[in-house]
Every structure is written in C-alpha cells, then in structure tokens.
UniProtKB/Swiss-Prot annotation:
Membrane-crossing segments per the record: 7-29
NCBIfam families with a match to the protein in the record: HIF-SF_euk (TIGR02251)
Coiled coil: none
Protein's organism: Bos taurus (Bovine)
Protein name per the record: CTD nuclear envelope phosphatase 1
C-alpha cells in the first residue's frame, strides 16, 4: 500500500516537474525573442579606401525601390476577423484614414530593424517607395517611416502599377529609364515579374520579432552600389530562388 502511494507520489512529482520545465522553457524563449527584438544593432560603416572611392565615382548612384506591406511593415485594420499578429501585440503606430467615405484605423507593425536599415541604405542609395496600396494609406505609412528625415521623398502607389490577371505589376521604368541602376526589394514576385533581374526577393513578414532579414541584406546592398549594372549580379540569384 505504501509502495503504491510512493509510486503515485513520484509520478505526480515527475508530471509536475515536466510541466514546470515546459513553462520555464516557454518563458526563456519569450525572453530571448524580446532581447533579440530590442538588442542594439550595429553595422559599421567604415571609411572607403581610395580604391573604393575611385570605383564608386565611376558608376552611377543606384536607386533602391522599396515595397511597404510585408516587406518593411505589416498592418491590419478594424474588422479583421483573423488578424495575423498575435493578440495583445501593440502596434508601432496607428493610422486613421478615410477610404470610400468610411474612416478606417490601421494598426501598423514595423519589421524589426527597419529604422536602422533605412538610415544605413539612405546613405548608399536614392530611396523610392513603390507600393500597390492606395495612396491615402501608403503615403501615411511612408511619412511615419521617413520620420521627418526626407529620405523617402519619391513615392509611387497603386495608380502607378499595371493590373494584370488580378495582380499589380510595378514597372520600374516609371521610376527611371536606366534599369542598370535600379534595385527593387519586394516580398511579392508578381510585383516585379517584368523586371526579375532587378529584384531582391524577401520573405513576407507578419509578426516575428526575431526576424533579421533587413539586417542580412545590408552587406549585399553595400556591395551592389559598386557595380556598373545591378542585373549582372541579381540575375544570378534567380537560379537559386533565394529569399532573404
């Protein structure tokens, strides 16, 4: 009888310990995600050598075309039954816009490290926003990301896209006639189907706080600005189907 009670007690203890350990692991992972999200980010911009300066002076300044939704930010609005963001996650900012005479609130979440990313690449490229979203929404998002830095002054919206088979195509020749100097960063392959050799694909982002895709792109973007034609490099990525 006593042995049976001891076994039952031991099993109860083991079950409790297992649950306690699982809860501890959950808290640890949550803390790690928080630390990663808010850790200090550094990407040292070293002075260019004389050789690098000379090389850069011989090529045109490049243009980096940036998509918004699921590339730099993710948003959802009032009335969404199944939001893609975990309930309780506070937005980075809220936009109130009027669409078809109806006020709509958008809860906008910034992709991890987007502010740092924009700060760095604005020193290397002329930045252009090109979104398939409506101008009244896209303009408000771009204003927030620009944050009075005047780095996102050129902007293109849905009316500048071409609608084909239900999807919006972004014609980069609208931005500049010289396609050798244009790079587009977009999560939607359909958006750049007319210019695949100018594209850097990036994974769609919704809510992962540990995402580092924008940081991972910095070395590549740093190197691309030295090329005579960005397509000579980016066209090779097509065969690998690599997403950043």
């Amino acid at each position: 009888m006593m042995r049976t009670q001891c076994l039952l007690g031991l099993r109860t203890f083991v079950a409790f310990a297992a649950k306690l350990w699982s809860f501890f692991i959950y808290l640890l992972r949550r803390q790690i995600r928080t630390v990663i999200q808010y850790q200090t980010v550094r990407y040292d911009i070293l002075p260019l050598s004389p050789v690098s300066r000379n090389r850069l002076s011989q090529v045109k300044r490049k243009i980096l075309v940036l998509d918004l939704d699921e590339t730099l930010i993710h948003s959802h609005h009032d009335g969404v039954l199944r939001p893609t963001v975990r309930p309780g996650t506070p937005p980075d900012f809220i936009l109130k816009v009027v669409i078809d005479k109806h006020p709509v609130r958008f809860f906008v979440h910034k992709r991890p490290h987007v502010d740092f990313f924009l700060e760095v690449v604005s020193q290397w490229y002329e930045l252009v926003v090109f979104t398939a979203s409506m101008e009244i929404y896209g303009s408000a998002v771009a204003d927030k990301l620009d944050n009075s830095r005047s780095i996102l002054k050129r902007r293109y919206y849905r009316q500048h896209c071409t609608l084909e088979l239900g999807s919006y195509i972004k014609d980069l020749s609208v931005v500049h006639s010289d396609l050798s100097s244009i790079v587009i960063l977009d999560n939607s392959p359909g958006a750049y189907r007319s210019h695949p050799d100018n594209a850097i694909p990036i994974k769609s982002w919704f809510s992962d706080p540990s995402d580092t895709a924008l940081l991972n792109l910095l070395p590549m973007l740093d190197a691309l600005r030295f090329t005579a034609d960005v397509r000579s490099v980016l066209s090779r990525n097509l065969h690998q189907h690599r997403l950043w």
